[in-house]
Amino acid sequence: MKKTLYLKFVLAYIIFSVFGIIIITTFVPTLTKEHLIKEKASELYSDASLIASTYAEQLYRNETTRDQVKEQLDFLSECSSTIIQIISPSGRLILDTTMEIDAENVETIKTFDSTALVGSYYMVGPFFDTYPSAEKLSVLAPITSDYKVKGYVVIHYGIEHIMESCYRLLNISYVILSILLLLSIIILIFFTEIVYRPLRKITRATEQYA
C-alpha cells in the first residue's frame, strides 16, 4: 500500500475536523437560537393566553381590581423572569409589572401597532421602541370580551436568557465534536496498526523478493 493512501486518510481527518468546527461555529448558533426562540414563544403565548382569559378578562369586566391583578401578575413575572403588561388596542398601558401605572398620567406606547404581528404571535426586538437598549422576545395574546378585542396581554422575555441557553447547547456541540474527532483518531490509529503497517511490511517483502 502506497504511503500516499495513508496521507489521504490523514488529510481527510484534518478536513473533517476543520469543516466540523466551521459548521458548528457558523450554523449551530443561529439554528439553535431560532429553535429556542420559537419554543419559548410558544410557552409564553400559552401563559399570555391564560392570563388574558382569566385575570385580564375579569379586570375588563370589573370583576376584580387592577391592584389585585397586578399582585398576581407581579408574582408570575418574578417567577418566570419576564415583564407582563396589559395594553389597550391604542397602546395605552393598563398594567405593567415593572411599575405603578398612574391613572392621571397615562403611559402610552406611541408606535404600538397590533397589526404588525399579523400571521404571528411574537416578535423579537425593542417592542415598538419600548426597550431600545435591550432586545426582547415579546408575545401578544388578545383579551376578548363580548366578542371584541379589549386589549392585549404582552409578555416580554430577555433575549439574553435565550442566548445563555444557546451558548450552553453550543458548548455541548463542541464536546460532541471533540468526542467524534477523538473516535476518528482511534480509528486512524487502529487502521495504522492493523492494516497499514502490516500491508506495508508485506509490500516491502514482496519488493525485496521480486
Map each language-model feature to its residues.
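Cytosolic-side ends of inner-membrane transmembrane helices, especially those
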Residues: 12, 25-33, 172, 176-197
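Juxtamembrane segments flanking the first transmembrane helix
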Residues: 1-93, 98-101, 164
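Glycine-rich acetyl-CoA-binding "A-motif" of GNAT/NAT acetyltransferases
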Residues: 149
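The DHp (HisKA) dimerization/phosphotransfer helix of two-component histidine kinases
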Residues: 50, 161, 205-209
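Membrane-proximal alpha-helical signal-transduction linkers
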Residues: 194-210
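Helix-start (N-cap) segments at beta->loop->alpha junctions
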Residues: 59, 144-146, 154-174
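A short beta-strand signature within small-molecule sensing/ligand-binding domains used
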Residues: 132-142
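Extracytoplasmic/periplasmic sensor domains and loops in membrane signaling proteins
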Residues: 70, 96-134
